[in-house]
Amino acid sequence: LYITTPYYAVEESMQKSLCIAADAGVDVRLLVPAIPDKKFAYVVAKTYWGELLAHGVKIYRYTPGFLHAKSVMVDREVALVGSTNMDYRTFQLHYECGVLFYHMPVVEELLEDLDDIMAQSSLYTLEEWNRRSWLERTFASVLRLGAIWL
């Protein structure tokens, strides 16, 4: 299960679902930008990463530039590509669109693109997440209270 999104701030049910999948042995990967366009949204996104990492989710931060792609790849044979971010605003407020591909050549092409993105990304670790400064942790916790508005 590969998820590509520039913004990550989800409801607890989605967060838990990804953790449960990883606990069950599913290869769950989150591909995000290392260079954000919205700093506060990025700080909030990182508050979710610790739990994901603790459950074995791999988080790749794309380093060459801003990654604005939005896709979900399931079992290397189903892909969803569209305008859907993984955040509250998308799921509760906005009308988004996407195209679902199943057993089509474009799925393999997307998989190749995702492999390229991961090759150009740095793997973020739980150790890195735990090394965040006290100031960053505090600031992020306060910002997360307003995650539904970011």
Which positions does each model-derived feature cover?
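PLD/PLD-like phosphodiesterase catalytic module centered on the HKD motif
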Residues: Y2-I3, Y7-L150
